[in-house]
Amino acid sequence: MRRRPLCTSASRVTASLLLSFLAVSSAAELPILPAPPISPQPHSSEKDFSLRHIFHHGTYKYPELHRRLDVPENAAVWAAEHLHSEHREPVPRLRVKAEPMSIQRLADRSKEAIDGILEWGRMKGRAVQLAEDDWTIDEIAGPNVTDRETVLSFARMASNAYILEPNTGEWEDVGGGFNYTEDFGWESDGLRGHIFADTENSTVVIGLKGTSPAMFDGSETTTKDKENDNLFFSCCCGQGGQFLWRQVCDCQTSAYTCNSTCLVTALREKNRYYYAAQDLYHNVTALYPHAEIWMAGHSLGGAVSSFLSLTFGHPAVTFEAVPEAMPASRLGLPVPPGHEIGSLQKRKMTGGYHFGHTADPIYMGQCNQATSVCTFGGYALQSVCHTGKKCVYDTVKDLGWRVGIGTHKIVEVIKDVIEKYDAPPICEPYINCTDCYTWKYFESNGTETTTTSTSKPTSTSKSSKSNTRTRTETCKTPGWWGCLDETTTGTQTSTSTPKHTSTSSTSTCKTPGWFGCKGRQRRANHNNNKVLAHNYPRPSTHRNNNILFLPNINFFMSVPRLVRRLSRRRRPSLPNKTEVVNSSANHFVYVLHA
């Protein structure tokens, strides 16, 4: 190849040198550009999980109990509807797809920092105001809730019970050295956590399951469950609603009006399930300090999983969870600046996904009607708002289901809902939601007392057999069938010996209901009017002045079946001078005139 001859012209050489100097000087003045960002390592799109540990933390009967059972790698694990179920199935493959997600959480999530924030909120009844610098938005690997198999795996991890083969592992006490080996029934009290880890121990799922609450009082634990749930999930401690709701405080001042100062004082009692879950969480993070934590849970366990998710900033996938936005606010969980305190349902980037179907009254916030099983059990579940995003299967429209508590169990949800649909529902935030919208809350100085005054007219002779009750003050709680204020009979007097005397009294109804005041009432003697109970069981304590209501409901009978049975039933033959004063699907009330 022929080489190009060198340039010998002085002018050309000078021009070339000048251009070279200019290029070098210009490059020196230019700013040094940063290196292009290194693309983040792609999150593993598929993870296989297996059961590694089972934690059990006591709540009421054994509050200091905390045990751990390690599951061997090749142990045979079976799934069942409950611990004593005869029907068992081998646990299928737990495969989960992951995807990048953004989550807003506290920058300092240490135990000491979180405990200080929660203690302040517990004493004040509201979340502490934190600066914007205290929060961070992190991109982490989260579950892909658009994948059907991922949703199924989370539902199985939130299942009721996992049973190991006999003689597989032993329970060990986690700290404290408390020995409950000889105590019977410790497994039925408390919160149980099933710990799943992937093959690389990079992601851990905590599946929480609370002990199934009994519907009717039979033990101290059941009563404590009702007190705990009615404090956090009802509008005002179970007051101002159904007759059978268990009342756990006296903060209602009038109809749909609640003293928030009184309510905060009642809420200072720690939520046993939430604090037990925190202790369980810290033990899991100690075992897996570098792993990303995901949460799963069903029903009450789903609500507690959501509490942990909002507190420590982890993704959560729950199933048929009790609406938890209102109790999360009452726990004083922290919220980022710019968010209205008490409206956690409007908070974004929480990482929470709540799956459920429209036929479940607990998930939909409808298990508070007069004929609901929750009401019969004394539970006042009035909260309706979820945090994060709701993922709703419309089983009422798509499958023709009727609303009922029987569709709440996780086994039915897996087999009859998730596996029946070809794809999971779309998860959307439900921000146009308000808890207890008919209620008014006010703050006070905490020194108010409720008093009841009675008038005592002078008397010159004995009262007669028939008494007429009149009120001397304005009715504070009007109802459908008259005033619902509780009446306390004053001293019966008369100025002579007439046939009828009048009794004046004043009252304050603490707990209004549909058919009268729920408080204890003193009945006057009514000899002229007698209530006839015609071949019916002994009535309950539900009395309303001169009328005795006779419940005739099978608690476990469906409403349509009840209506059909009542429509076929003939009313009993009655004596003369008998008046039917009220008849409904729930009661037959007759009054026999003397």
UniProtKB/Swiss-Prot annotation:
Gene3D superfamilies: alpha/beta hydrolase. The keyword Transmembrane helix applies. Glycans are attached at N144, N179, N201, N259, N283, N432, N445, N576, N582. InterPro entries: AB_hydrolase_fold, ATG15_Lipase, Fungal_lipase-type. Residues 447-473, 489-509 are annotated as: Disordered. It is found in: Endosome, Multivesicular body membrane; Prevacuolar compartment membrane. GO terms for biological process: multivesicular body membrane disassembly; neutral lipid catabolic process; phosphatidylserine catabolic process; piecemeal microautophagy of the nucleus. Its EC number is 3.1.1.3. Residues 447-469 have a biased composition (Low complexity). It is a single-pass type II membrane protein. The active site is at S299. The chain crosses the membrane at residues 13-33. Its main location: membrane. Keywords: Autophagy, Endosome, Glycoprotein, Hydrolase, Lipid degradation, Lipid metabolism, Membrane, Signal-anchor, Transmembrane, Transmembrane helix. Lipase which is essential for lysis of subvacuolar cytoplasm to vacuole targeted bodies and intravacuolar autophagic bodies. Involved in the lysis of intravacuolar multivesicular body (MVB) vesicles. The intravacuolar membrane disintegration by ATG15 is critical to life span extension. Belongs to the AB hydrolase superfamily. Lipase family. This is Putative lipase ATG15-1. It comes from Phaeosphaeria nodorum (strain SN15 / ATCC MYA-4574 / FGSC 10173). The lineage of its organism: Eukaryota, Fungi, Dikarya, Ascomycota, Pezizomycotina. The gene is ATG15-1.
